């Protein structure tokens, strides 16, 4: 296919371009890679010992792996939107609860009681599980389902670049934000959880069992995107032999 990056800028591919940017962006501002990169530091901050912090990091990794496997089993039954929405709400609630516990219990010198420290660990595992069966795998699956062949290479390239770019940005800024916001960092990521869940609810159509060649119809029938892409079915018919 010739000039995929030029084609993806065309009006009829505007929804795919938006999703190629928005989905990986939201995937990273969930804060999941912060947990992956800095979990031992985070767990030591709330009062767990060094060994317990490392073990807790392994535990969150196992939870993420299991929940991703669960996603593989249920995604075709419940659909992409349902998992996006449920996972987003699960992450939002757990982040708010973690932030609330830390605001209430974390003193100026750091550390909380053992009971609350393990409560935070459980809540973070719930958060990781929410990501693992929703935004984790679906952040890669859905973009692969919405790009037609003529823009697939461009769309997937944009998706990967945006993902890695915001992985880098979030990872580089997290420690500074943690020092500045303290427990408020969880409310910060929770706020993005609200935004991305509303975005999916309003703007992402269901892609389950939709062939790639039929995706243009999905956009044309969507309440918002039909105003953006217009009706190019006539043009398609004129081009047909």
Regions found by a protein language model. Give the residues of each.
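Alpha-helical transmembrane bundle of multi-pass membrane proteins
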Residues: 1-241
